[in-house]
Amino acid sequence: MITLTIFSPTDFQGLRGPLIIYDPEDPQKHLYDVDDESTIFQVGDSWHNSTVPLLAGYVATGIVPVSDSGTVDGAGRFQGGPAVPFAVTNVVKGQRYRLRIINQSARNVFTISIDKHFLTIIEADGVATQPLLVNEIEMLAGQRYSAIVSTPPQLSGSLALELINMAHSFTQTRPLINNAPFVSGDPSRNLNQNATLSRGILRYAGGRREDPRTPMTLGPDPTNPLAFVEANLKPLVNNPPGIPDVNITLNLVVTTGAAQWNVNNVSYLPPVVPTLVKILAGADEPANFNVTENTFLLPVNATIQITFPPMLMTKLTPSTYTEYVTIFLILLHPIDAFPKNNFWVVKSNSSDSDVINTIDPIKRDVTAVGAEGTIVRFTTDNIVMASGTDEVRTDVEPDAAWEGLCPAYDALPSALQ
């Protein structure tokens, strides 16, 4: 039994929140002193426009939208905007805090760092890990990490770090969380975006109530960074994957300048009868699904390996497009095998292309695919009535049914909405 952090992703515009299940018998409880609501950090992205114009612009140009700002516990600033208060976490010297960091973004990738402090990762996506000391953590949308931060008694003064070079200015209010470059989008396309304004505050008892006065940093010593590498994560309790019974290769190709992803040279096209409706009706043969549904049938109680080769970019001009990749992994008894089950990351995109770990790979439920290639394994032994991939949806345009979902709400006076 371990302490579990669950995040339910949603749309660009929607409610976001975590479910924290605390384990009174956490085997790593001796590593920290404080683990409560004050140490939950929900980082996210803020969008001033709705998905409707964002989607229209993406489809027309192929240019990936960029958020207006990053937030910590719902608070953040944008360039030229109001100086809203940053989220503050009050700490006491000499204590060890378990930070539960959750990336609730629709798109943003964040680099998490704390001025003059190391982070010790002990959990990834609800799976306990061997302690891993780092300066910073890169987090994809949907990922969760628990990291311990110590507040040494010798830090009675105040120190600040610049992003690259160490500075010796002094403050007792430290930048807590900083925004990284944004995945698949160019921040210069959104003038509201200023990565240095996406931060929270770790405030020592007795510290002045002021904003951080330093730029982004990557932890205590930028000259000797302890860079975070996903492949270095090891499970606290090892449960190595079995030999795969089924091997699937998914070549993902992004067409530059167009809103199109291809999976094995197939661009997803929505069928007349939705894929999930077919599954719920009992479809369990390849002939029941169109090629453009990207549907794979899997045996029950098997080990599945999916290989994502290094991704390539192409400048082909497509005749059709999709805004997202949907891959249905259908079992003969419909179960949700991927990604709601944790999978072993036997080859992380963070490692060299020839580094494969089948001895003690980390298990998690969100990982990256990209230039180095990724290989995951999972077992089809968790039978539930669902199937398919989870995703943050920006591709669904509102229709009459959507508009009619909340007529009672729309009829309320504006003061009550």
From Swiss-Prot:
This is Laccase-like protein claX. Belongs to the multicopper oxidase family. GO terms for molecular function: copper ion binding; oxidoreductase activity. The gene is claX. InterPro entries: Cu-oxidase_2nd (IPR001117), Cu-oxidase_C (IPR011706), Cu-oxidase_fam (IPR045087), Cupredoxin (IPR008972). It comes from the Eukaryota. Laccase-like protein; part of the gene cluster that mediates the biosynthesis of clavilactone A, a meroterpenoid that features a unique benzo-fused ten-membered carbocyclic ring unit with an alpha,beta-epoxy-gamma-lactone moiety, forming an intriguing 10/5/3 tricyclic nested skeleton. ClaR, ClaS and ClaT are sufficient to produce clavilactone A and the function of claX, if any, has still to be identified. The biosynthesis begins with the prenyltransferase claS that transfers geranyl pyrophosphate (GPP) to hydroquinone to produces geranylhydroquinon. Gene3D superfamilies: Cupredoxins - blue copper proteins (2.60.40.420). Transmembrane segments: none annotated.
